[in-house]
Swiss-Prot record:
Gene Ontology BP, a term: positive regulation of fat cell differentiation
GO cellular component terms, semicolon-separated: cytoplasm
Tissue-wise expression: Highly expressed in white adipose tissue compared with other organs with higher expression in mature adipocyte fraction. Significant expression is also detected in the heart, brain, and pancreas.
Keywords associated with the record: Cytoplasm
Entry-linked InterPro entries: MEDAG/TEX26 (IPR043460)
Native organism: Mus musculus (Mouse)
Protein name: Mesenteric estrogen-dependent adipogenesis protein
Amino acid sequence: MATAACEPVARPSLTSISSGELRSLWTCDCELALLPLSQLLRLQPGAFQLRGEQLLVPGPGEPAAARGGFNVFGDGLVRLEGQLYRLSSYIKRYVELTNYCDYKDYRETILSKPMVFFINVQTKKDISKERTYAFLVNTRHPKIRRQIEQGMDMVISSVIGESYRLQFDFQEVVKNFFPPGTIVLNGENLSFTYEFKADALFDFFYWFGLSNSTVKVHGKVLNLTSTNPEKKETIKLFLEKMSEPLIRRSSFSDRKFSVTSRGSIDDVFNCNLSPRSSVTEPLLAEFSFPSLLECEETSSQLI
């Protein structure tokens, strides 16, 4: 298909990242990302493992957790290839907090690692096909971190001493990423909520639901789907770098992001890949969306 024919249907959110971009990053310059859960399991066996009827994720007290990893948000179950698996360790999508110490611990915990949410996707053309995706939120990227921190700060300043409920929602950005005709079966999985219950005698705003707020988080979504062995190795390194333990730099010049990862990204991404090649392939290749596939192939050639 000609380039001109692709331009009207090209979508800004359908973004691929080139190998050249990966090699030049200071740290993981990724706001949001999507990839099949099956691919994530293969690329990050230290962080996610299927064992029997469980999807094992290192918990806070396990040695693997000290080396970084991800914060999985969920309700305890994930469906992969038609089978239900129990999550061994996860952060509940709804929590209640009753004091400042709980709030502080919760805030530090959710921002300490990249977030992971699991969703199931179908197409209207073939509802018999269902695929499970992992949605990644890079909490060390300044744009994403700022939206979460500002949301938490603003609600506190507006309800001083009172109870409130705050939800962070990624449904809109994910649904806009997929092409038309795609059905996200469990979109509610793309949000998490905490409720702070203050010991207030008269909590009128809370009683009448006037202190409930929702922050719709927005950002650029990267498609990390790939079947190319060389590109998958690059994505693996990319994910490992994103999930490294966080350390704070003492020098302002070293702190390009509010919190940075350990080590130098340049050492990790010196891969022998063409600077013009694309790391990703069409997100829904098996669902056959011709306009999407052709446009992504064309855009990759133009990078």
